[in-house]
């Protein structure tokens, strides 16, 4: 019969404190994006987060290799993984609502900060200093923040292109607005991506594989 191991004093060892942090993160898959839009395929927050992290990492590499920059790709990608984590608690507030007024935008920002704090507090205390920078997006340079924001917009544009490729004109205006907003950022790394990588998103699988 298995026995519970005991300490030298004979008492059973103390069970480690449990944490809900990653269980909460896993709930991203249940949070839909584009909730006010008619979609041919739904997209959840987990998918968007993973794609944004990939894009952010690539943009940082472009910054370093092609434009002589010094963006920290690993740190930016980690921040991208958590950039929408507060929406686990707040939900994905539609953009027209979030930015309806300056007061609404500021109110949502405060709610977002509170949600970030709640998530951080779910971590075991010794881990909080290590994960805090990624979870709160702290310690990024202005360039790194710009690249992360550009990656977020690129993910939205890619979603629009995917919907348009399926014949869904519901995303025509959103695609134009997101594309204009990205161009207004004057981000050469994103401009390079748009010219070099984005056209392939309109291709079929056979075209992508050269069949």
Where are the model-predicted features located?
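Alpha-helical, largely C-terminal catalytic domains
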Residues: 1-211
């Amino acid at each position: 019969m298995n026995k519970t191991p005991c300490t030298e004093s004979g008492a059973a060892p103390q069970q480690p404190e449990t944490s809900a942090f990653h269980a909460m993160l896993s709930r991203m898959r249940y949070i839909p994006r584009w909730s006010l839009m008619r979609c041919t395929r739904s997209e959840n927050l987990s998918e968007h987060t993973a794609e944004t992290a990939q894009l952010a990492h690539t943009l940082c590499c472009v910054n370093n290799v092609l434009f002589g920059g010094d963006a920290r790709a690993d740190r930016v990608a980690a921040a991208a993984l958590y950039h929408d984590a507060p929406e686990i608690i707040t939900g994905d507030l539609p953009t027209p609502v979030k930015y309806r007024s300056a007061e609404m935008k500021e109110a949502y920002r405060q709610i977002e900060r509170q949600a970030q704090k709640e998530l951080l507090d779910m971590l075991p205390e010794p881990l909080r200093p290590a994960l805090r920078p990624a979870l709160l997006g702290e310690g990024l340079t202005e360039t790194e923040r710009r690249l992360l924001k550009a990656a977020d917009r690129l993910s939205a544009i890619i979603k629009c292109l995917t919907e348009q490729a399926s014949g869904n004109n519901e995303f025509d205006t959103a695609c134009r607005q997101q594309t204009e907003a990205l161009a207004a950022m004057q981000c050469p790394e994103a401009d390079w991506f748009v010219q070099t990588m984005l056209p392939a998103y309109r291709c079929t699988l056979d075209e992508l594989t050269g069949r």
